[in-house]
Amino acid sequence: MKIFNTLTRQKEEFVPLEEGKVKMYVCGPTVYNLIHIGNARPMIIFDTVRRYLEYKGYEVNYVSNFTDVDDKIIKKAIEEGVSAEEISQRYIEECKKDMAGMNVKPATTHPQATQEIDGMISMIQTLMDKGYAYAVADGTVYFRVKKFKEYGKLSHKNLDDLQSGFRALQVSGEDQKEDPLDFVLWKPKKEGEPYWTSPWCDGRPGWHIECSVMSKKYLGDEIDIHAGGEDLIFPHHENEIAQSECCNDKIFARYWMHNAFLNIDNRKMSKSLGNFRTVREISEQYDLQVLRFFMLNAHYRSPLNFSADLMESSKNALERITEAAGRLKDRKEKASAVELTEAEEKLLAEAEGYVKKFEEAMEDDFNTADALAAVFELVKFANTNVTEESSATFAEGILEILVKLCDVLGLAAVKKEEILDKEIEDLIAERQEARKAKNFARADEIRDELLAKGIILKDTREGVKWKRA
């Protein structure tokens, strides 16, 4: 299995630190709003990487954080007149709903930055003790970039070039820094902002230290794969390497994976352009399996363009898979013959060739586009060779292969059983009773159960409205 490593800019054979186990960290979203389709790309891509590793027999410890303290969260909290914690917890729950809709498996651990402050203070103190960090008069703590001789190795940036650029960009209030390149590990509190007590001042951590600490706590000093969007390569991941390797005296991550940007109608997605699309908005038009298919139908390192036409194409393509699976299921249930014929045995063996093609694509830096091409070859094979005369065992064998490959991609080949309207109404009524009784855990369970069955709830003044995804 080969992975393109951003660190070396080449494909490398994947060799885990410990045989049969993979330690993987993926930078998660900053939770101040509903996630947008740009956030969705790394979630879907690296969930698929995880699924393939598990398919190959690896035990994957998959950690993905929520950044729940940030300027954007604080700004939103001030605008709404609520606490930053209320904002972050609200959008963590909304993010989990969207992840369930996209069939993104929950991480082994979803740490939250605000729950790991003690670890951050401890790592900063270690860096100070080693001479890699220093505090200034107002209590701000900075990392000494030039003391880490390998700084720039991930982004392949030259320190001298960075120096001139950063000197021009130095903002007011940072004149106490020893060097313009030095970045913040801890910052003093501001009026109305959340803060924690530290040896240097009451304040909060810098963004970069959060992931270094959460990765160390839940995965150890060294990990196999660190992943995220390509916008995180510099400065975030570069700074993570500096902090972690200077603190732990070990190589932080063996393989660095980054997905490319997503544009909308060939333009960068932004609120100012009015083309900002949330996953929730997409779910009102399409089953989120369609969004997942769309994301996987391109190589993760290639820029991806989102458009209505491409989503329609993805919807139609996904239907070809589900319709083929439906026909196979129907044939399995209705076939009069049960035993495989000699010809069918040969055809089943031939079908395994598509599994090999699928695996070859995935083992070449997780080429999901080519893996999907192998799935469609299997669909064509099934449509041609499974007929009304086919045995139940043959139809079942082909269906099992199709379902297996789709499951690795997080796609449901066989449509979920339709949930009846009465069942939905009964569950909504139970949820309302749970909320009245302040049993919010049960209410959330019911909501998630319905979401998993493709039912979206919307709480309104007139009561709870629901619709099928």
PLM segments and residue spans:
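N-terminal, positively charged nucleic-acid-binding surface of large information/translation enzymes
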Residues: 8-13, 17-105, 462-466
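Structural preference for alpha-helix termini/caps and helix-kink/transition segments
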Residues: 268-269, 275-469
